[in-house]
């Protein structure tokens, strides 16, 4: 796997030992799927499904859980999908960009793939809301097992833990993050040991590894068994994280962590819970905590809460990262992004995302009240994202001539059948809570599509009223205005049109700088732009330059740092102290007669008005900035 350099980062990246990387991956990647044993088997036998915890049913459910982990995580993600990377990066946003790169420029297929990617991203944000709520709530519910009278305190304690977690986000996770791996590793060892302890009491539970028991369950329960898949899929929530975090740890480390630690420990724990239920069917009320000896109950509650917090942290951090990528690709408005680490570029904090997530997580916990009710809502976001990932992977592989068509067809049939069955099993629970993540997804999707469409209309209007730059400059030189020392940098989305900021500067100030740079910043469909391709400078007239700066969608755009490289190009010697950046600030006026429906126009105006200023996003010093306003009707 190749690595690409970050902007402004000339230091070599030192590689850690494999064991250290694997331990870190366990802490970040597998927190979500690692806390699934807290609620999966309990949900499968909830009154919603009407299943009796008898011998055949228990073995059937366990077999479905085991083979769901094998098919969805081991085969689909670990073996197949993690082979598809965008210069080492994974995740639905990276896969969308990669798939679009295989298509002819301007084709409708790019638009359709973009729609799929946006909706998958919207569902991921919904997952980021439900995961912290259900993980922490399930962990704290262990208090009900230890002390039944504590039931009334479960929700308040859960809210306190979650609020504290979100309040601490602005300080970053660089220090405490080093403990995530060891704590999560201890969690997996602990649940594996508890599983072995219970398996010894009823070793016949090991028969559940035979897929016949899963097939027997389908034959025994018929169509009703499809409903139960809505609970079984909870065992593979977090599978998407293996792919999304591939760029941070590498495919090899994630595969090793899954095969040698996570999968064995999860399998042992699920089988252990099943063994307990075979011996004591009344334990089905909360088989995870019932399977733990009394002396270890409180330590396990503490460890489970820590693991749930770490799982939540991984989703929160992932939401920040995905938001940053979406901003770079133009899917959402610019937001304030703060870097919480001086040594690690990828550690960021996005306040708007943080407080929005906290508000929605609190409403989710209060609205659902317990993990059983929440489980009905959880699966839709997860299975929807997984199915979209599968479709995008198939579209990408179809464009690759090296992939045998027969093999691709077989993979497509199996993966779509499995994902489709899981998605259907969750969507039929619409009135039981599945409406919630779908509503979240539709709302986020609407915001993203409105922003994309609004930006396109805005650029079209500005281009329509614009003047061709190459035609404008010769006329300007015939009667040049007064020149002042220094460099003026005009940010523009279209390098062929005279920037509005330049027109306003000439109209009101009637001066021109010695050097004038028309700067366009472009985000590529790759994670990191190579330093050799970062900067393109084109002299267009005496004292005028057209400059393109390229960033990858995983990078934080730092315009001044990128311009420092211009000293290597003849004619421009970028001096920050003698440079003024000119930015046009558009005031958008909604119109009922063109573009989008008026309600979407007003939504776009609201988002545009609250977007972070360009200087903050591009890291331009405020004392070197001149902002000139213009009105645009869309």
Swiss-Prot record:
Q: Give TM regions.
A: 21-41, 58-78, 110-130, 148-168, 180-200, 217-237, 258-278, 296-316, 348-368, 377-397, 408-428, 432-452
> What membrane topology is given?
Multi-pass membrane protein
Q: List the InterPro entries.
A: K+_transporter (IPR003855), K_trans_C (IPR053952), K_trans_N (IPR053951), Kup (IPR023051)
Sorted alphabetically, the Gene Ontology cellular component annotations on this record are: plasma membrane
- One of its Pfam families is K_trans_C
Q: What is its main location?
A: membrane
Q: Where in the cell is it found?
A: Cell inner membrane
UniProt keywords, alphabetically: Cell inner membrane, Cell membrane, Ion transport, Membrane, Potassium, Potassium transport, Symport, Transmembrane, Transmembrane helix, Transport
- Give the UniProt family note: Belongs to the HAK/KUP transporter (TC 2.A.72) family.
Question: What is the protein name stated in its UniProt record?
Answer: Probable potassium transport system protein Kup
Name of the gene this protein is made from: kup
